[in-house]
């Protein structure tokens, strides 16, 4: 099972490496997402993922830019997006404009098991605050995942993330603006969002062999979302990153 997850992660990383080459001037968020979905299918993605607890299968992930990154959604994901009437989640036809962030959170469903990875891109240069918050997301990964090991409380990981965010004065932007998600990670496997949930009310602890996604993200009005998400394996002694793709913000106009 673990080797299938590792193989899926390798395909996931390879797909993300092609994203700058898929961008064209004048695209909307949906245009770019369609090109990414095509590339994922070419590499063996099954094209859908299953969601825990909601008896549903939906398309391959979301792409958020500009104010749509802060749009609330009825679905229990880290960020929402207006989407469409058929599925109020994710891209909604927003033009990709200069100075906006492009957050890509597409599921690595290349077989039976899922991997989950988010990376942030830009159309030209972003504000200094956007780069600061993106670096803060990376710092949260470094600090919090150092504490992750068998027996670690999921609530402690969430609360440690909040502590770092509050010390940086970034609370109003963390995990949304109008509607802020009350978790910072989740398990995954056959479904994209399984137990445990990294949230303040969780009673769960990490156990060897668990696969978790960790996704501290920030939303800036008019700019979009920044931050990353990685999939981690809980080992006997700590944590292993299964999605070690480049983590910096990549300017799509400089491809």
Predicted regions and their residues:
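Active-site neighborhoods and metal-handling regions in enzymes and metal-associated proteins
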Residues: 1-255
